[in-house]
Amino acid sequence: MKIKDTLNMGKTSFPMRAGLPKNEPIWQKKWDEDHVYEQRQKLNEGKPTFMLHDGPPFANGNIHMGHALNKISKDIIVRYKSMNGFRAPYVPGWDTHGLPIEQQLAKQGVKRKEMSMTDYRELCRQFAMQEIDKQRTDFKRLGVMGDWEHPYITLQHHYEASEIRVFGAMAKKGYIYHGLKPVYWSWSSESTLAEAEIEYHDDKSPSIYVAFKVVDGKGLLDTDTYLVIWTTTPWTIPANYGITVNPRFDYVQVQVGDKKYVVAAELLDRVAEEIGWENPKILKTFKGTDMDKMTAQHPLYDRTSLVMNADHVTLDAGTGLVHTAPGHGEDDYKVGVKYGLPVVSVVDAKGYMNEYAPGFEGVFYDDANKQITQALADKGALLKLDFFTHSYPHDWRTKKPVIFRATTQWFASIDAFRDQILKAIDTVDFKPSWGKTRLYNMIRDRGDWVISRQRAWGVPLPIFYAEDGEPIIEEETINHVADLFGKYGSNVWFEREAKDLLPEGYTNPHSPNGQFTKEKDIMDVWFDSGSSHQAVLAARPELSFPADLYLEGSDQYRGWFNSSLITSVAATGVAPYRGILSQGFTLDGKGRKMSKSLGNTIVPATIEKQFGAEIIRLWVATVDSSSDVRVSVDNFAQTSEAYRKIRNTMRFMVANTGDFDPEKDTVAYDELGSVDRYMMVRLNQIIKQVKTAYDAYDFATVEKTISSFLVNDLSAFYLDVAKDVVYIEAKDDPKRRGMQTVMFAALLTVTKLITPILPHTAEEVWPYLKQPEAYAALADMPEAEQFDDESQLLDIWSGFMDFRSEVQKALELARDNKVIGKSLEAAVTVYPSEPVRDMLDDVDANVMQLLITSHFEIAPATTKAPADAEQFDDMAVVVKHADGEVCPRCRMVRTDIGTDPKLPQLCSRCAAIVEANFPDAVTNGFDK
């Protein structure tokens, strides 16, 4: 027999190397085959519901790091809630209609106008479903658990029917109307855009100052005076029908050479510098209200422009007199309608100037900028041309600039119930808290929602037209269309004539001959996803409305959060969510947006192959995702190192509880040693802290708390101390079983606590824990216990940990001075202050063992510390090399080796243990 055969050296099949890229898919396959998600739902039947509603990603392309951050965050929450007393179903969704899919088909050579609408839409559907299959595989590879076989998809028949009913509820309340208004228009997509479909990029634009000659100055201004406007869109000058001034501002008439001009008094110096006026002389000062209804000559056409009053005019830029084209701006439209001006758009759907811009017909609007500027110069009306770079709206899909253009569209009136929406926001809990202000301001300031789109792939607007052109939006017709969509899908709209889409026997006084036509436009895709609260939450029996949580990127304050809120309040009177948790964007390591053109993209699949999905999940749990998050391969390398520490600590506990049967070997709390009870109390603290952090969606605190406990409390202290007991003492020694009790409790608790973040690792540990549940995901979160001596233990051991830290400093100095090598070679004498002496009395433990030294003594209170002692605030420490020899079994330096003649190689402690438990060693001796 060898000496090592008498030691309880932990052995385990739990591998040191995780092999995550290879092993994760094996676990994921097992979860699918054993229906672990479904088992969890069954276990939670009858419990309170926690409803996290998945915002649907667009079904186009493989997932990126933003998707991973979002889906993993959701998975952590749902897994935690499922393990902590809630029924928390998770139904993933996909957004499937819209321009990107049409663009993808065009890239594949599909010619929309050369096939029937139904055939084209079928190609769109097939493409969307293929993309869903790709993304579903990607999301499952991240370890995200949910009802993947029954997702919600915005092209599903029942979904489209529910969306039509939401539209019907809004129409019934009078919120839907048809109107000619300026809207964001994408000439590159040939369609209107919602605010959520706009993104801003820097663009170079012309900046021009233009003079309009006064025609009727209302007795205040001479006809040889010029009103000066400033604009960055010269192409809209042909659409000018007015000039707007602020009634409260002061304006001045100034003499410059032989010309007279009018600008806002406060902007005179800036305008003079810009245009190059020398010594402008103020002739008159007056209020904007005095200029109301003056007229000025249009600089290009034989008509006048009306001067109007409105409060939207500011002094931030320009001249204080605003060029007003009611067909090309929201404020322009509002003031123009108030004053009875025509609403004219001078560009067509493709962005080319039309017949309302004589002299420029057929010219692309951006090219027209140059031609119109030249025409103004030829007429003597151009005072200054310059160029500047500014942030300008672009189509979020095509990345091309957009324009404001008046077209006849279908709108959802926000004014009609804006106050109700704002009140609903007050019922919602926001994380971060600034989200409330952001959403509130967006709703407060937003215009009406243009919901019609001039595209093919989407849900048709369920509107008919009578013979006289009167729109038909009636409860009866809308419900009938919803029923048809529920049965056949929205393609039925394109397959049948209008009369076959109307209820049988339907008549309308506006169609005496029974003739009807149908709307050609489709719904805004934000109306699609924004109806999910009714199409999914209210429709599926296992779900509930309103949701407890919507969790998406901060861009969704103007997207899904916004559209869902509007449709929900309109249709049901309440917000669709009780809480909103928003996240920032994922950027590269330098803080730049990831893009293929910059070559700085990192995709989850790459990280999974190199490190594993578990490392992405742990990374998600370490970052503050409430703001933008930087991503680099280095991040994952660092996270992988943090994971290694977690895994190694858990592996040590697995190995050293291998011979521990929790049913028969557990030591009662009251019978544990002081340090063991302290660790149980610390474990109790960890449970409380981690669950509080989970409840607050504070994953970083969850991870930090668990990692710190594993690395600092366990690995660097308790487990290190435990080796002398767990390895050395007899297998069933009460002290050993006590420490194993703590280790097992820590391992079981930590495994449960990390399951939401590291589910693959938790499942790998789980079989070693001998629990009744087949999977960690089917277990419940640990509950904190009540220990009567908790505060007392924390107080004592907090003092001891400070004491230990100072002794370790003294040991480190002794090591540096070559007095000792390892701490087990040390003999430590302390000269403590009275409070430290009392604390050491209270610790009630083997301090030598706790310090991992071979000798420890407390000097008598009357003894003064020698001059060479290491001095600390509350004690002095002397470290010497321990006297004696190293015991080959316990590795301590002992003076009693050989005192037992039967086992002369061992110290008396080891000899007693071996003699009692390994009689063969006594009889035959140890192998050499």
UniProtKB/Swiss-Prot annotation:
Keyword set, alphabetical order: Aminoacyl-tRNA synthetase, ATP-binding, Cytoplasm, Ligase, Metal-binding, Nucleotide-binding, Protein biosynthesis, Zinc
- Keyword Phosphoprotein applies: no
Name the catalysed reactions.
tRNA(Ile) + L-isoleucine + ATP = L-isoleucyl-tRNA(Ile) + AMP + diphosphate
**Which molecular-function annotations from GO does this UniProt entry contain?**
aminoacyl-tRNA deacylase activity; ATP binding; isoleucine-tRNA ligase activity; tRNA binding; zinc ion binding
Q: Which residues bind ATP?
A: 596
InterPro entries linked: aa-tRNA-synth_I_CS, aa-tRNA-synth_Ia, Anticodon_Ile_BEm, Ile-tRNA-ligase, Ile-tRNA-ligase_type1, Ile-tRNA_ligase, M/V/L/I-tRNA-synth_anticd-bd, Rossmann-like_a/b/a_fold
Q: Indicate the secretion signal residues.
A: none
Q: Where is this motif: 'KMSKS' region?
A: 593-597
Please give the cofactor(s) recorded in the UniProt entry for this protein.
Answer: Zn(2+)
List where the motif 'HIGH' region lies: 57-67
Q: Which Gene3D superfamilies match?
A: 1.10.730.20, HUPs (3.40.50.620), Ile-tRNA synthetase CP2 domain-like (1.10.10.830)
| Self-association state and partner proteins as the record states | Monomer.
Homology family = Belongs to the class-I aminoacyl-tRNA synthetase family. IleS type 1 subfamily.
Entry comment, domain topic? IleRS has two distinct active sites: one for aminoacylation and one for editing. The misactivated valine is translocated from the active site to the editing site, which sterically excludes the correctly activated isoleucine. The single editing site contains two valyl binding pockets, one specific for each substrate (Val-AMP or Val-tRNA(Ile)).
Q: Which NCBIfam families match?
A: ileS (TIGR00392)
- According to UniProt, the name of this protein is Isoleucine--tRNA ligase
- What species is given as this protein's source? Lacticaseibacillus casei (strain BL23)
Q: What is this organism's lineage?
A: Bacteria, Bacillati, Bacillota, Bacilli, Lactobacillales
- Gene expressing this chain: ileS
